Design a protein with these regions (language model features):
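Short helix-loop "hinge" at the ATP-lid/N-box region of the Bergerat-fold HATPase_c
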Residues: 85-86
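Glycine-rich ATP-binding loops of the HATPase_c
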Residues: 148-156
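Short conserved segments within the C-terminal catalytic ATPase subdomain
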Residues: 50-59
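Short conserved segment of the HATPase_c
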Residues: 113-125
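Short alpha-helical segment of the dimerization/phosphotransfer core of two-component systems
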Residues: 4-9
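Conserved micro-motifs of the catalytic ATP-binding
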Residues: 24-29, 62, 66-72
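A conserved beta-strand-to-alpha-helix junction within the catalytic ATP-binding
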Residues: 30-48
Length: 168
C-alpha cells in the first residue's frame, strides 16, 4: 500500500515537473518523421487488458500517415486521449480512432463534457475524476502548442471526440 502511494506521488511530481518545463518552453523537441498509425497501434496494444476489462473495442480508421514530430511527446498525447476515452466510455462500446492526412481523433460513446467546461479542461488541475491529477490535458495542450498543432474537443450525440491537427 505504501509503495503504491509513493509511486502515485512520484508520478504526480514527475508530471508537475514535465508540465512546468513545457509551460516554460524549456523542452527541446526531438522531431523526426513518424508513422502515426504504427505508433497508435503500438499504444493500443499496451491498453489491451484495460480494454478487455471494460469490454471495449477499438476501431482504427485511416491509412499510414507520416508526420514530423517528437515521437515520445506525441505518444504522451495519444496515451492521454486514449486513457480518457477508455475511462469515460460506456461498457461494451467501441472507441474510434481516426487518422487522416492532417488530423488525429479519438471518439468514445460515453458521458459528455459539460459545455461550460470545454475550455477549462485544458488547464492544470482540472479533472472530472477524483483519482485524476488534472494535469494530463494541460500537458497535452503544451505538447501540441510546442508542435504548433491545433487541438480541441467536442461532444457527439452519444459521446466525446478529442482531436489534434497539423499543417500538411
Amino acid at each position: 500500500m505504501i509503495n503504491k502511494e509513493i509511486s502515485v506521488i512520484n508520478d504526480l511530481v514527475l508530471q508537475m515537473l514535465d508540465l512546468s518545463k513545457l509551460e516554460a518552453k524549456a523542452v527541446t523537441l526531438d522531431k523526426k518523421e513518424i508513422d502515426l498509425r504504427e505508433l497508435t497501434e503500438d499504444i493500443v496494444d499496451d491498453y489491451e487488458q484495460l480494454l478487455m476489462d471494460k469490454k471495449l473495442k477499438i476501431e482504427i480508421q485511416g491509412e499510414d500517415v507520416l508526420i514530423v514530430s517528437d515521437r515520445k511527446r506525441i505518444e504522451m498525447v495519444i496515451q492521454n486521449y486514449l486513457s480518457n476515452a477508455i475511462k469515460h466510455a460506456f461498457i461494451n462500446s467501441t472507441i474510434k480512432i481516426k487518422i487522416k492526412e492532417n488530423e488525429f481523433s479519438i471518439e468514445n460513446k460515453g458521458k459528455q463534457i459539460d459545455e461550460n467546461r470545454m475550455d477549462s479542461i485544458w488547464e492544470s488541475f482540472v479533472s472530472d475524476d477524483q483519482k485524476g491529477t488534472g494535469l494530463g490535458l494541460a500537458i497535452v495542450r503544451n505538447i501540441l502548442e510546442l508542435h504548433e498543432m491545433s487541438y480541441g474537443v467536442h461532444n457527439l450525440e452519444d459521446g466525446v471526440e478529442f482531436y489534434f491537427r497539423w499543417k500538411k
